[in-house]
Amino acid sequence: MAVNDPIADMLTRIRNASEARHATTVVPASRLARSIAEVLKREGFIADFEESGEGVQRHLVLSLKYKGKNQQPIIKALKRVSKPGLRVYSNRRDLPRVLGGIGIAIISTSQGIMTDRDARRQGVGGEVLCYVW
């Protein structure tokens, strides 16, 4: 089945696997998905990711992180902001702060995919893809 919004699909797969306490989840591979996974890993929301498969069958295997003996998910929520039907852009002065800096906004800029903090530091704006906290 064709997916109209691969970013929302990726976020939903992560959210569902995290709520079900799965150790890993599989998402279709793309450069954008890989970039988002790199940001999530760098910010400590996922443990690791690896690419597997060949050609059209490529996918990313994301290792999720949990804390405590009750295995509470590190990712509390993921929210898609810019959607195919309504794109949301932000200039460098109006970049959003998620929960006062506790969470992150993932931004697609001319310099690549990065967090709101990195975009502010580099002085660039872009499309606000999602919030993670």
From Swiss-Prot:
Specify the superkingdom: Bacteria
Give the matching InterPro entries: Ribosomal_uS8, Ribosomal_uS8_CS, Ribosomal_uS8_sf
* Keyword vocabulary terms for this entry: Ribonucleoprotein, Ribosomal protein, RNA-binding, rRNA-binding
Q: What Pfam families has UniProt attached to this entry? A: Ribosomal_S8 (PF00410)
Give GO BP annotations, semicolon-separated: translation
Can you supply one Gene Ontology CC term for this chain's record? ribosome
- Which GO molecular function annotation, any one, does this entry have? rRNA binding
Q: What functional role does this protein have?
A: One of the primary rRNA binding proteins, it binds directly to 16S rRNA central domain where it helps coordinate assembly of the platform of the 30S subunit.
Q: To which protein family does this belong?
A: Belongs to the universal ribosomal protein uS8 family.
Q: State whether it acts alone or in a complex, and with which partners, per the record.
A: Part of the 30S ribosomal subunit. Contacts proteins S5 and S12.
NCBIfam families (alphabetical): PRK00136.1
This chain belongs to which protein, by name?
Small ribosomal subunit protein uS8
